[in-house]
From Swiss-Prot:
Gene3D superfamilies: Peptidyl-tRNA hydrolase. GO terms for biological process: protein quality control for misfolded or incompletely synthesized proteins; rescue of stalled ribosome. Pfam families: Pept_tRNA_hydro. This is Peptidyl-tRNA hydrolase. It comes from the Bacteria. It comes from Borreliella afzelii (strain PKo) (Borrelia afzelii). Monomer.
């Protein structure tokens, strides 16, 4: 079984290091840590690695967050994957900074990126990794998720990304529950 890790974010330098782009940042860490390079297709950038005999595909959409679903179903056929191979990495304003929640399957979400994906797929039956970006102390959630991290927050997240980059690439059906326990109990 392969794994397709889809990191959510918004394209463009103006969005780098924002709370909404933690999915992109984690994938960038996995790419650099494994000496990989991103290749470009029409709607996304991707990289591929092998872990033992499993293929792991890393994908960063070139669409804005709210249009993430437009990658499907073509991305599945491009890499010979299906919904059970999908792991979406995204921000979560309800989790404290440095805390994660890995879920095997999920219900509908208020996150617009997930709404877009679930709407196109006709299902929310895929895995997700929520990365806490801190509590929303501002009234306007859009302003909050598009705000940049401060230096101390970036330092904490770098440690988290380092940890997650090792944990995610060898995730499988047989060790998923162990990974949930390890990732969900971590705090950076």
């Amino acid at each position: 079984m392969g794994l397709l890790i889809l990191g959510l974010g918004n394209p463009g330098l103006e969005f780098s290091l924002t709370r909404h782009n933690v999915g992109f940042s984690l994938l960038d860490k996995i790419v650099s840590k494994n000496g990989l390079f991103l290749k470009r297709k029409k709607k996304y950038e991707y990289s591929e690695l092998r872990v033992i005999s499993r293929r792991v595909i890393l994908v960063k959409p070139l669409t804005y967050m709210n249009l993430s679903g437009s990658l499907f179903p073509s991305i599945f056929s491009d890499f010979y994957m299906c919904i059970k191979n999908l792991l979406v990495v995204l921000d979560n304003v309800d989790l404290p900074l440095g805390k994660c929640r890995l879920k095997e399957r999920g219900g509908m979400s208020t996150h617009n990126g997930l709404k877009s994906i679930s709407s196109v797929l006709g299902s929310s039956n895929y895995s997700r990794l929520y990365i806490g970006v801190g509590s929303n102390v501002m009234r306007d959630i859009k302003s909050f998720v598009l705000s940049r991290f401060c230096k101390d927050e970036i330092d904490r997240l770098e440690k988290l990304y380092d940890f997650l980059s090792d944990e995610l690439i060898d995730i499988s059906e047989s060790n998923f529950k162990d990974k949930v326990q390890k990732i969900n109990s971590s705090n950076f």
